[in-house]
Amino acid sequence: MSLEKLIRPKSIAIVGVTDKLGFGRSAALSIVKSKETDRVYYVNPKREELFGRKCYKTIQEVPEVVDCVVVCTPRNVVPSVLKDSGELGTKAAVVYASGFAEEGTEEGTNLENQLIEISNTYDMKILGPNCMGLLNCIDKVNLWAGGSKWDLDTKKPGIGIVGQSGFITAEIVSSDYFNISYGFSTGNGNIVTLEDAVDFLVDDKYASVIAIYLEGLKNPQKFIDALKRAAQKRKPIIILKSGRSEKGAISAASHTGNLAGSSKAFESIFEKYGVISVENLEQFMCLAQAFSVLDGNLPTNSNFAAINFSGGENTICADLAEENGVELAEISSETKEEMKKYLPGFATPKNPLDATTALFHEKDMIVGLLHTFEKDDSVGFTMVGANIRDEENEMHETLCQAVSEARKQGLKKPVFAVPTLEGNRYLDYRTRLEDNQVPIMSSVGTTFTCFNKMAKFIDYDYSKRTLEFKAVKKRESNNVVALSELDSKIEMKKYGVPVPGQGNAKSIDELDEILKYIKYPVVLKINSSEILHKSDVGGVKIGIKNRDEAVDAYNEILTNVKKAKPDANIDGILVQEMVESGIEIIIGITNDDQFGPMLLVGLGGVFVEVFKDTTLYPLPINHDEAIMMLKKLKSFKLLNGYRGSKPCDIDALADMMVKLGKYAYENKDEVKEIDLNPVFVYPKGKGVCAVDALIVKYK
């Protein structure tokens, strides 16, 4: 979808201009202020002129076919305005009005459907309804409903904002804290979607970072295609996803379905494509502005040096760094010796550094320390403690001068100014620091959370990821059927997933035949696709050492199951080799409605839903990604050897994950869920074994 006429219109008509407070007034004033005024036209049938400009009675009277029509009328008038504009040949529109499909009424939905039909008929790109509009600071286009405060003369790369909440997006865009290049409020987003805006920003050179307030998706394929391109370009995307809390999938047929909800699915997509996911607006704005100011000059590694003016600040830095998984650089002895050249005699050269109150006024000391850390390869970036309040201050004047001088002398590594507390920042200091690629971060607590997220982006390597994505087909029905354990294991074995030796007995004679080739001890289990949790109905007997015990177990299982589940269809009794126990892991598949099959791995056995130590990842998956998943688990210590225990066969476990993922991805339109639980993981070199298996398919 080309958005050229919407984003860079040469001519604009504003329908519904008024001098009363509201969108019709603010849009009229801000658009005229931003554009060449002889190609902006007011339309109001009841007024001859407004704000010193002629008003046309209808869109047909406007002396040219405009590129974009901005509709400021009540909702019931919107379709006719758009239809008239479309018939003239206008190819873009912005609709601010609410009361359409978001209202949840038949009338509102019908009105929105009319807009969609008009868009299709006239090939018109309609932003909205129920939106705040569009801002393009690069080409001086202000179609934002809420004002005209932005610097529309910039040609500097900045932040591309996309939001699905009008109010939240307006708050973000209106902040003095942001260097904005573009702003999109997509509203209901059924015509020009959030995905369309992101797609544009990924390829635009003036959007150095993309910041998205995301509620949901219309087109997952287009969204992920854009994320993939951004990952390959190393363009940061920051997303604040709303609706992260979940009550769970009550009707899920397996453990995996219970654990994997839409919020986790989104987070797993973000991880795969290198998206920076944030939890609140403070992190969102802090990171977006930091990436914008750095403009591609990112740290070479995520270890940092800290320059503060008190021991208390150093203690806070050290604590927050450890809590957030951010590493203080292990500076070399040569670095420490060179630091002594610039520090007062009573200061100790170390990291974090208490530079004493000399930090307030010793410009040359700051310049020297920055260059010293520049030469130490262990240091990826430097942070300087600086409470840059909304007032002039000697310390911050010194810092501004020092950074400017250091940059002129060739300083390359990133520098961050880190206040202890949140607050307004003195504009002159902020401008001077940012001109020298020094972001002023948020409060120190938020800063270290942001450093952690920035470190993950720095360390992200798309070449180690499988970025392939194909959206699942829309299903007409979500009815499912569970395969029996026997059939599930047969499917798994075809893809090379190790399972125990097994057979299915429907009689004592068949039991005897199976016991001829499966050695004792054995396990007997009920084999029924209608009984998912066998132990709950007395359907499992383990440690069977001879034929007499096997016959007794066979009969007892049938008795137990018929009593607990009298209506269940029984396919027989599964006779299974009793394999040696190992560390119990669950590996599963859940098929997300938007993103398709995802692989889950975690601590397994009967406690899987108690501890919920799991991680989720989109398919397909390779060996490197499988290892990454395992390392995220709290229980990875058990796999890696803990308190004298032998390390487990992690490579074999990762190999099983890849094979299960291959099966699920190749059959994604058929498979809803899979549970391999437990999977026994043996010591290194001894392999793995899926002891139990459940596959749930769509009918």
PLM regions with names:
Residues 1-675, 679-699:
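Catalytic-core regions of core metabolic enzymes
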